[in-house]
């Protein structure tokens, strides 16, 4: 017998999904989530510092971590509290680089088959030989119409999940390690971020008291909370080559999450930006343009979809590199690309793709899927009209990514101007927004 419950957040993809699985020889009547597990797997290495994962694992249980780190690198990246729990509770610790295995097989970032095979080898719900046979039969039935090549790639992924597992030697000295697994929010974040967003994102929303929502009884939430989330879930993301870039800004135009942005600076401004903010003379802005140009990526907001690389017409201007290599650039993005004082209003216009991308996006860092095409249009619309927009949102993907409280991607500028977003689930959306439009002159008179 088997039972499955699933726990997940509001994000369309790359959010957290917890699969609570029970297996037994007798009917299972439990009506609650698993809180003490024999086996726990973490499929994204960044979750270790975002969620309380390891404490739900029983002593002598098995822990599987999908990560790009080698065994001798684990102590550099895994918080001391987690390693101490593993050592103190005699946990059987395994690692696998499922992303590397799936990419080598031509499956891109689809590592589910690799990780499923690894689960059956470690959990031993049924003999691993039987599990492998069943999985390969399922592959043939599921992907048979897609051709022999796709079938063979997925069969190879099953074998990779069995063979690529590495058992980690748990060191006794880990029992003496310290270091909090979940990092506290920065000291300068607003109270709503500290008291509401952070607990909800850590799957602790049920612990919040009613008093935490004082002042928001009518359901309104402040704009722009998504900028504080900094999910950091992309394992690989683009790095900009200043010598190859032709400064067309297509990458920024096509980015679904506003995570890559062009910046223009004058000579005086270049003296005050952080070290490492390298620029080149701006192109296409006139012969005597005083500006220098840089395309800046936000490592913690990028989802690694690769749309920017596909859109880029200049070979080599953008290449993919590891998240670890790009982490230091977050400061450059936050202090310069997000700083409205560096916006050049004399350059911004709606006459070309290039120039409109120098405008502030009033829709950023949403919970949309990696590579989403819909948010690209919303972001562009916000760059054109964002400081004076009323938005009535019909139910669907766009409402989930736009109003999934407390993460709101619509934001306001330094003058307090920005889109006003509303969503009414049970009303005709055209009628709903038209009445808002009709009522506005009356409210202002």
Q: PLM features: what roles do these ranges have?
A:
Residues 1-200, 270, 274-275:
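Active-site cofactor/cluster-binding pocket
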Residues 14-17, 52-53, 74-78, 105-108, ...:
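Short acidic, glycine/serine/threonine-rich loops at helix termini
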Residues 114, 127-141, 218-237, 262-295, ...:
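Ferredoxin-type iron-sulfur electron-transfer modules in oxidoreductases and energy-metabolism complexes
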Residues 132-136, 140, 403-436:
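Mobile "lid/hinge" segments at catalytic clefts and subdomain interfaces of large enzymes
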Residues 172-229, 233-238:
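Intrinsic disorder at enzyme termini
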Residues 224-226, 250-269, 298, 303-325, ...:
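Iron-sulfur cluster-binding cysteine motifs and their immediate structural context
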Residues 363-395, 399, 403-405:
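N-terminal amphipathic, basic-rich helices that act as targeting or association modules
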Residues 436-442:
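Residue-level detector of conserved catalytic or cofactor/ligand-binding positions
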């Amino acid at each position: 017998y088997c039972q499955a419950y699933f726990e997940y957040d509001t994000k369309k993809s790359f959010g957290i999904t917890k699969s609570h699985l029970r297996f037994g020889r007798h009917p299972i009547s439990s009506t609650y989530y698993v809180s003490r597990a024999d086996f726990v797997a973490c499929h994204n290495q960044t979750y270790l510092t975002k969620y309380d994962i390891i404490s739900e694992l029983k002593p002598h249980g098995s822990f599987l971590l999908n990560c790009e780190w080698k065994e001798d690198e684990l102590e550099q990246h895994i918080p001391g509290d987690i390693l101490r729990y593993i050592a103190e509770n005699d946990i059987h610790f395994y690692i696998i680089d499922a992303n590397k295995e799936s990419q080598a097989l031509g499956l891109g970032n689809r590592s589910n088959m690799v990780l499923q095979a690894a689960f059956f080898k470690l959990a031993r719900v049924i003999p691993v030989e039987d599990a492998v046979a069943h999985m390969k039969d399922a592959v043939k039935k599921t992907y048979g119409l897609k051709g022999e090549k796709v079938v063979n790639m997925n069969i190879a992924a099953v074998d990779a999940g069995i063979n690529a597992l590495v058992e980690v030697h748990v060191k006794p000295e880990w029992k003496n390690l310290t270091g909090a697994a979940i990092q506290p929010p920065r000291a300068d974040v607003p109270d709503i971020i500290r008291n509401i967003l952070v607990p909800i994102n850590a799957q602790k929303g049920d612990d919040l008291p009613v008093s935490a929502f004082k002042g928001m009884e009518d359901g309104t939430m402040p704009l722009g909370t998504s900028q504080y989330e900094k999910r950091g879930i992309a394992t690989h993301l683009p790095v900009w080559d200043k010598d190859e870039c032709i400064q067309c800004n297509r990458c920024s135009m096509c980015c679904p999450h506003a995570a890559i942005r062009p910046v223009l600076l004058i000579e005086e401004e270049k003296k005050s930006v952080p070290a490492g903010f390298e620029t080149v003379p701006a192109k296409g802005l006139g012969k005597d343009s005083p500006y220098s140009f840089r395309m800046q990526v936000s490592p913690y907001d990028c989802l690694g979809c690769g749309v920017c690389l596909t859109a880029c017409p200049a070979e080599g201007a953008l290449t993919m590199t590891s998240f670890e290599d790009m982490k230091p650039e977050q400061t450059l993005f936050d202090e310069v690309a997000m700083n409205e004082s560096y916006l050049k209003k004399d350059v911004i216009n709606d006459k070309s793709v290039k120039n409109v991308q120098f405008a502030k996006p009033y829709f950023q860092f949403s919970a949309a899927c990696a590579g989403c095409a819909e948010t690209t249009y919303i972001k562009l619309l916000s760059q054109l009209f964002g400081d004076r927009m009323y938005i009535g949102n019909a139910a669907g993907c766009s409402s989930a990514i736009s109003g999934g409280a407390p993460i709101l991607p619509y934001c306001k500028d330094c003058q307090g101007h920005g889109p006003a977003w509303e969503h009414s689930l049970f009303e005709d959306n055209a009628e709903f927004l038209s009445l808002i439009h009709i009522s506005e002159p009356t409210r202002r008179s």
